[in-house]
Regions:
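A surface/extracellular/periplasmic glyco- and lipid-processing/surface-interacting theme
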Residues: 2-6, 10, 15-192
């Protein structure tokens, strides 16, 4: 996920089974720049709650019966399934991706609508609707340090409680940001 359209990334525990496996959820502002984003997986109630906080349209591939109440909420906007299928050599559940415009899988000879077509054929707007609550976060204009605080603690390594993949954030002094690690190694995007 390149910096071109990255907005907010959540790592969410999807199940208390399977060693508390996690999935990523990305909130994208500049969705009209998406060439390929995914893979798209099934949703849980948490995905609907977070999408509503951002006044976003949730893109997912269905889910268990207990998401039905969330799909039915007035503020819930979502596109379920039918996204582009890429022939990438992976299992079927890892081949579904969001695109902005139509995509044709030349190996299968099938064309899939992108977000552009899906919005045009839906009741959803591409601008904020009546449920928009305003800006989500407020960040400092400049760097904030706690060097002058005697009670400050070091936060160079943050271990998140996800046993399955051992998610860890490690502070990178060169960039002044945290790098994400899982399974003991730095996680790199395709653009990295």
């Amino acid at each position: 996920l390149g910096d071109v359209y990255k907005r907010q990334v959540y790592e969410i525990m999807n199940s208390t089974l399977n060693d508390r496996i996690t999935r990523f959820m990305v909130v994208v502002k500049d969705w009209d720049k998406i060439e390929q984003l995914g893979s798209i997986r099934s949703a849980r109630p948490t995905n609907f709650m977070l999408a509503a906080e951002w006044n976003a349209v949730l893109c997912h591939d269905g889910g268990p019966f207990f998401i039905n109440d969330w799909v039915a909420k007035d503020y819930s906007a979502n596109f379920s399934g039918g996204f582009a299928r890429y022939s990438n050599g992976k299992a079927a559940e890892f081949t579904e991706y969001i695109t902005y415009d139509k995509y044709t899988n030349t190996q299968k000879g099938k064309t899939y609508d992108g977000l552009k077509q899906r919005f045009a054929n839906s009741k959803y707007t591409t601008t904020y609707n009546d449920y928009y609550q305003g800006p989500h976060f407020k960040f400092a204009d400049g760097e904030v340090t706690f060097d002058d605080r005697s009670d400050a603690i070091s936060a160079t390594t943050i271990e998140l409680p996800f046993k399955h993949n051992g998610s860890t954030l490690k502070y990178n002094e060169e960039t002044g940001t945290y790098d994400y690690y899982e399974y003991g190694s730095a996680h790199k995007d395709a653009d990295s």
